[in-house]
Design a protein with these regions (language model features):
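Helical hinge/lid and interdomain linker segments adjacent to catalytic or ligand-binding clefts
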Residues: 122-231
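C-terminal motif of bacterial Sec signal peptides marking the signal peptidase cleavage site
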Residues: 17-20
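Pro/Thr/Ser/Gly-rich low-complexity, intrinsically disordered linker/stalk tracts
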Residues: 22-58, 88, 101-118
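Catalytic beta-strand/loop cores that center a nucleophilic Ser/Cys/Thr
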Residues: 252-357, 362
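Solvent-exposed loop/turn segments flanking beta-strands in beta-repeat/beta-sandwich domains
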Residues: 54-69
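A glycine-rich, often tryptophan-bearing local segment used as a flexible ligand/cofactor-contacting loop or short
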Residues: 181-302
Length: 394
């Protein structure tokens, strides 16, 4: 009897179970259609991906992966995407997936992109403004020399900086030298210090690009954030200048009369430069001649390291304090300076987010066009510049 009751209960439970399953509406898994016809076209190093979207309901956008890592998420019925300045001589795999508003993502379609190139990085000259006819005579002389000596070099306008990359242009020279230009980087030519141009210059150095900043352009080292504003060049002049009979030279032994000297005469930027002996100048030792007698503008844009606004240590001296605070090397000062006063040529090393190097020449003697005659030491100006550009591209 007990056995029959148990059998009856079991049959009843099975019946209930079957009835419950038949009442459940099981949803089928949606089929996520994928994109088709994925292809690319290349314009130099810019690559445009194109594809066809599936004809499916609920499509919300696409996802693009580069070598398996998310590169972009695009909303809506998008059928193309631009990848700017892709790496050369390497295989890159782009995968495009369709995304749906139910949260599902389709399988991807993949295309291999390869741009072959044997081009080498070039030197660049950044104009302070696009209109060359408005350049100062010293800026024009520097530009003419650059064009003559770097036929493969690139002359850039400020507007070009948005599309400049260190692997194509590894170094950029900026020369600004003007009578009557007030101190402060915001007083540099307006095109040069536009917000987008300063941001592009900063990104250029952060990505490993190198800058040569000469005369009033040395102030850009603060504009791009490589040094703080209070450590911008603070020894400044912009007057018309005057006649002189002496020779203006650069002293590469910083602290010449001090207990601890910093001798940079073997540095690469001085290779081959003509020196003038102490017997002729009265300065400490042999110094590097940059400008001979005649009419000279006397424009400085450098650092007085004794100025307390720099907020640097004076231990063991202000030159070392400046170098430590800014991760730099002071390579030269005025030739007549025998102590630790001033920094006229400064090499700012790669530092933190700034992977590139910034080399500044702010000495008054670095004048590209002596107004009343040919500078008898013009060859030293030119060789110093060439050496600096060679040093920066290493």
């Amino acid at each position: 009897m007990k056995t029959n009751i148990l059998k009856t209960m079991a049959v009843a439970l099975v019946g209930l179970s079957l009835a419950a399953c038949s009442d459940v509406d099981i949803q089928s898994t949606p089929y996520s259609e994928k994109v088709t016809d994925l292809a690319y076209t290349a314009d130099g190093r810019d690559v445009t991906l194109t594809w066809q979207l599936p004809q499916a309901e609920g499509l919300s956008g696409v996802r693009i992966d580069k070598d398996g890592t998310l590169a972009a998420e695009l909303d809506g019925a998008v059928t193309s995407w631009l990848a700017k300045h892709v790496a050369v001589n390497t295989d890159i795999y782009y995968t495009v997936k369709a995304c749906y508003d139910n949260g599902l993502t389709s399988e991807g379609q993949t295309v291999k992109v390869r741009i072959d190139s044997d081009a080498k990085a070039k030197a660049g000259f950044l104009l302070p403004q696009a209109d060359e006819s408005t350049l100062d005579d010293d800026e024009k002389a520097a530009l003419d020399w650059f064009r003559a000596n770097y036929p493969d070099g690139v002359v850039l306008t400020p507007a070009d900086m948005a599309d400049v990359y260190p692997d194509e242009i590894s170094e950029i020279w900026v020369q600004v030298d003007r009578v009557g230009m007030p101190q402060g980087w915001r007083n540099l030519p307006s095109e040069l210090v536009a917000d987008d141009v300063i941001a592009a210059l900063a990104n250029y150095v952060k990505n490993g690009g190198n800058l040569l900043l000469t005369k009033h352009a040395t102030q850009l080292v603060a504009a791009i954030g490589r040094v703080s504003e209070n450590r911008a060049p603070n020894l400044y002049s912009d007057g018309a200048g005057g006649e002189g009979t002496d020779i203006w030279t650069a002293q590469a032994i910083v602290g010449y009369d001090m207990t601890e000297r910093y001798d940079h005469t073997s540095h690469a930027i001085y290779k081959g430069l003509v020196t003038v002996p102490e017997s002729q100048t009265g300065f400490g030792g042999d110094t590097y001649a940059l400008e001979g007698p005649g009419m000279r503008e006397d424009h400085n844009c450098m650092w007085d390291c004794n100025n307390t606004s720099l907020e640097i240590s004076n231990e063991p001296n202000v030159i070392k304090g400046f170098e430590t605070a800014t991760n730099s090397t002071v390579l030269a000062t005025w030739a007549h300076v025998r102590d630790y006063c001033c920094a006229g040529i400064v090499d700012f090393n790669p530092d933190g987010d700034y992977l590139g190097r910034v080399l500044c020449i702010g000495l008054n003697a670095y004048e590209w066009n002596q107004n009343d005659r040919t500078n008898e030491y013009q060859s030293n100006i030119e060789l110093l510049t060439k050496n600096c550009l060679d040093y920066l591209k290493q």
